[in-house]
């Protein structure tokens, strides 16, 4: 079982990043791959969670130990798998908002996450309420990882962001509903498009 990895980012896709260390490239699923676009060929440290299946061995990466702990709490809930847990974490810039929703039993807020219905939201509250307070300090680490990549062409960056939303589990209908809002941002980076898209999704 892996605890963390330190290596260079060599590839970024809507679904995962590749981190190379000692001549081996590790495919790692992260909540927002484009956060690492500005880290290409730079050493980073990710805390890892490994999922072993009959047909695959999957790695999920997190910028801080607190993020990893939050992810493990989420996937302990019946109905939330690793992909859903990662999508939930990607959908909120402030994980404190997620924690507050659970503590406040805000089912409406929780059902805004992709793949989370009323039953799963209620299960999240039942299983996690009162158990997440120690994780609220994780946001500083998330903010520190914000990429400073050069601006790519608007169409390419926007297309990458929309593809990343699809990878997180949002439907075509949901994505189309916020596309005009993203276009109104003008030319910017994929990470900025995606971060704003996730905020728009949570406000719908």
UniProtKB/Swiss-Prot annotation:
What Pfam families does the record point to?
Answer: HHH_5, RuvA_C, RuvA_N
Region named Domain II: 64-143
Q: Where is this region: Domain III?
A: 153-204
Name one process (GO BP) from the record.
Answer: DNA repair
Q: Where is the signal peptide?
A: none
Q: Which GO terms describe its cellular component?
A: cytoplasm; Holliday junction helicase complex; Holliday junction resolvase complex
Which keywords has UniProt assigned to this entry? Cytoplasm, DNA damage, DNA recombination, DNA repair, DNA-binding
Q: Where, per UniProt, does this protein localize?
A: Cytoplasm
Positions of region (Flexible linker) = 144-152
User: MF terms per GO, please?
Assistant: ATP binding; four-way junction DNA binding; four-way junction helicase activity
Q: Where is this region: Domain I?
A: 1-63
InterPro entries from the UniProt entry: DNA_helicase_Holl-junc_RuvA_I (IPR013849), Hlx-hairpin-Hlx_DNA-bd_motif (IPR003583), NA-bd_OB-fold (IPR012340), RuvA (IPR000085), RuvA_2-like (IPR010994), RuvA_C (IPR011114), RuvA_C_sf (IPR036267)
Which family is it part of?
A: Belongs to the RuvA family.
**Assembly information from the UniProt record:** Homotetramer. Forms an RuvA(8)-RuvB(12)-Holliday junction (HJ) complex. HJ DNA is sandwiched between 2 RuvA tetramers; dsDNA enters through RuvA and exits via RuvB. An RuvB hexamer assembles on each DNA strand where it exits the tetramer. Each RuvB hexamer is contacted by two RuvA subunits (via domain III) on 2 adjacent RuvB subunits; this complex drives branch migration. In the full resolvosome a probable DNA-RuvA(4)-RuvB(12)-RuvC(2) complex forms which resolves the HJ.
Q: What is known of its domains?
A: Has three domains with a flexible linker between the domains II and III and assumes an 'L' shape. Domain III is highly mobile and contacts RuvB.
Q: What is this protein for, i.e. what is its function?
A: The RuvA-RuvB-RuvC complex processes Holliday junction (HJ) DNA during genetic recombination and DNA repair, while the RuvA-RuvB complex plays an important role in the rescue of blocked DNA replication forks via replication fork reversal (RFR). RuvA specifically binds to HJ cruciform DNA, conferring on it an open structure. The RuvB hexamer acts as an ATP-dependent pump, pulling dsDNA into and through the RuvAB complex. HJ branch migration allows RuvC to scan DNA until it finds its consensus sequence, where it cleaves and resolves the cruciform DNA.
Output this protein's name: Holliday junction branch migration complex subunit RuvA
Q: Which organism is it from?
A: Enterococcus faecalis (strain ATCC 700802 / V583)
Q: Point out the gene that encodes the protein.
A: ruvA
């Amino acid at each position: 079982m892996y605890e963390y990895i330190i290596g260079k980012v060599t590839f970024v896709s809507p679904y995962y990043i590749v981190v190379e260390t000692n001549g081996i490239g590790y495919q790692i699923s992260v909540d927002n791959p484009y956060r690492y676009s500005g880290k290409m060929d730079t050493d980073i440290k990710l805390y890892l969670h490994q999922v072993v299946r009959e047909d695959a061995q999957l790695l999920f990466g997190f910028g801080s130990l607190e993020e990893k702990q939050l992810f493990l709490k989420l996937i302990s809930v019946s109905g939330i798998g690793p992909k859903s847990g990662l999508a939930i974490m990607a959908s909120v810039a402030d994980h404190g908002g997620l924690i507050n929703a659970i503590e406040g039993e805000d089912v409406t807020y929780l059902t805004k996450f992709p793949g989370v219905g009323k039953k799963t939201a209620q299960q999240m509250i039942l299983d996690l309420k009162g158990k997440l307070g120690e994780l609220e300090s994780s946001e500083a680490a998330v903010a520190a990882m914000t990429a400073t990549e050069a601006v790519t062409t608007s169409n390419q960056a926007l297309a990458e962001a929309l593809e990343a939303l699809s990878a997180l589990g949002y439907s075509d209908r949901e994505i189309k509903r916020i596309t005009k809002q993203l276009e109104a941002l003008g030319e910017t980076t994929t990470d900025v498009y995606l971060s704003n898209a996730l905020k728009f999704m949570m406000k719908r």
